[in-house]
Amino acid sequence: ESIFHDLLESSGVFRTCNLTRSEEILNGDTVIYADYHNIESYLNYDLSRQINKKYSQEEVEKLIKDLAHFTSNIWQTHSFNEGNTRTISIFIVKYLRYLGYQVNNDIFKDHSLYYRNSLVLSSYYNPKYNITNNYLPLNNFYHKVLLDNSISLDNDTLYQEALFNNNKPKIRTLK
């Protein structure tokens, strides 16, 4: 809780109600977030599964795939009313450092909208439009973090065409 000192009163406190968020990338639809009653059990489950995984430096592709699923799961739990993506990005930087990778928060800051949108897509499912969880953008983000800084992260490629009746929107131009 000390990292939340001098912030909003609700900072660092699990949310006490269910929520929805209108997502621009989904034409106003929302991800289905975890029921607030289950936040702690979901986080305990995901953290206990991930903490037992070990990766050699040669297994970076496996790490990227696992990291995308793990991050998606804890983000979809959406523990707090505000600040979930920022909190998770800091946590992932610390986790990657623990695993021996030299990373900082710059790429998360410089591509914050892409990162958030990739988390949305990895957590979104809509059978009516034949849309399933898409981890590819999140995998690409982690590839950029760990392997190839030259990878382009373009928000305009992330919109869900089926939700816009094939009328492609212009996504916000923030990184």
Regions found by a protein language model. Give the residues of each.
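FIC/Doc superfamily catalytic core
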Residues: 1-175
